[in-house]
Amino acid sequence: KDGYPVDSKGCKLSCVANNYCDNQCKMKKASGGHCYAMSCYCEGLPENAKVSDSATNIC
């Protein structure tokens, strides 16, 4: 699945550079990622990966 991965507090990973996000996403077993709207966006995450949900976002 695709989406904005979250940290242990449930917050999106903030970013300014695409290479940072690509590395962070790959560590979460995604195919890759990029920085979009100041947050990391991952593509190809496992289905069980936790991603940001605007309905429950508390950050």
UniProtKB/Swiss-Prot annotation:
Pfam families hit by this protein: Toxin_3
Domain of life of the native organism: Eukaryota
Main localization, broad class: secreted
LCN-type CS-alpha/beta domain sequence ranges: 1-59
Coiled coil, from the record: none
GO biological process: one example: defense response
Cellular localisation: Secreted
Disulfide pattern: C11-C59, C15-C35, C21-C40, C25-C42
Gene Ontology molecular function: any one: toxin activity
Record flagged with keyword Disulfide bond: yes
Gene Ontology CC annotation, any one: extracellular region
Family of the protein in this entry: Belongs to the long (4 C-C) scorpion toxin superfamily. Sodium channel inhibitor family.
Name of this chain's protein: Alpha-like toxin CsEv5
Keyword DNA-binding assigned: no
Signal peptide: none
Keyword terms: Disulfide bond, Ion channel impairing toxin, Neurotoxin, Secreted, Toxin, Voltage-gated sodium channel impairing toxin
This protein's domain notes: Has the structural arrangement of an alpha-helix connected to antiparallel beta-sheets by disulfide bonds (CS-alpha/beta).
